[in-house]
């Protein structure tokens, strides 16, 4: 380190008056210390608690620390476990790597059948909790791409069997109409099945792989499990994805509550 006598005027000025960039870096370092990171986790945990409460009841005094409120909440491992009640929430595994651009995959090891069965209960839904460290993405690829691809694959895999079952059921309703869009011969992927931030090029790349994804799912899903899925989704209708963040929490939570009624 130079002494003041050895410093030039420019170096002394920088010591006394740091540049904007140096100030910005110093602030960033302070914001990313352990205390601030834990405060951020706590704030997001409180946000999840509030959303769970709003979805489950209109009573603002509801105690979220109960089995009923968390019966449909899944923490996506591992990151999501920081933000959901670890004692009450269930867990699922959707990997971001399966949704990375130019590397879209359907995992034969991570079918997450329990998520489907829970979402298909009467008035049911599933809230999958996850987070991303990206400063440019609102949702991690696990939520924004892997989950909707997974839902689209399962809808197409069971569509024909669901329609056949509903035709035999005298109590079938207009819910059947929703299934016809998943029975196209080319297993077309519709634009509204993925979030708006997925580009058209990426959507086209996923479409090309959908037929193989459906085959992959059917090749590993046991017959008894497949039958259970068909019966469950025949009652509830196809899987639909909604994305809730701080920016759109009110509108989408209101929509979820309306669907459950």
Give the label of every model feature segment.
Residues 1-261:
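Non-catalytic regulatory/accessory regions that flank a structured catalytic core
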């Amino acid at each position: 380190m130079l002494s003041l006598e050895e410093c030039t005027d420019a170096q002394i000025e920088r010591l006394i008056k740091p540049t904007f960039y140096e100030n910005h870096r110093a602030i960033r370092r302070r914001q990313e210390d352990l205390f601030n990171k834990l405060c951020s986790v706590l704030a997001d945990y409180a946000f999840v608690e509030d959303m769970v409460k709003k979805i489950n009841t209109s009573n603002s005094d509801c105690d979220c620390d109960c089995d009923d409120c968390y019966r449909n909440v899944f923490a996506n491992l591992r990151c999501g476990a920081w933000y959901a009640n670890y004692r009450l929430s269930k867990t699922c595994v959707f990997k971001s790597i399966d949704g990375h651009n130019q590397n879209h995959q359907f995992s034969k090891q991570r079918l997450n059948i329990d998520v489907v069965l829970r979402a298909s209960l009467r008035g049911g839904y599933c809230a999958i909790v996850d987070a991303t460290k990206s400063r440019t993405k609102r949702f991690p690829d696990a939520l924004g791409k892997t989950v909707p691809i997974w839902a689209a694959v399962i809808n197409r895999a069971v569509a024909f069997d669901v329609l056949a079952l509903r035709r035999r059921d005298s109590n079938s309703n207009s819910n059947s109409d929703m299934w016809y869009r998943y029975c196209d011969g080319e297993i077309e992927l519709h634009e509204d099945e993925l979030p708006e931030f997925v580009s058209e090029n990426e959507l086209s790349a996923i479409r090309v792989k959908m037929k193989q994804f459906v085959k992959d799912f059917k090749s590993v899903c046991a017959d008894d499990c497949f039958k259970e899925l068909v019966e469950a989704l025949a009652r509830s209708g196809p899987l639909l994805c909604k994305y809730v963040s701080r920016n759109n929490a009110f509108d989408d939570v209101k929509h979820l509550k309306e669907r459950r009624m």
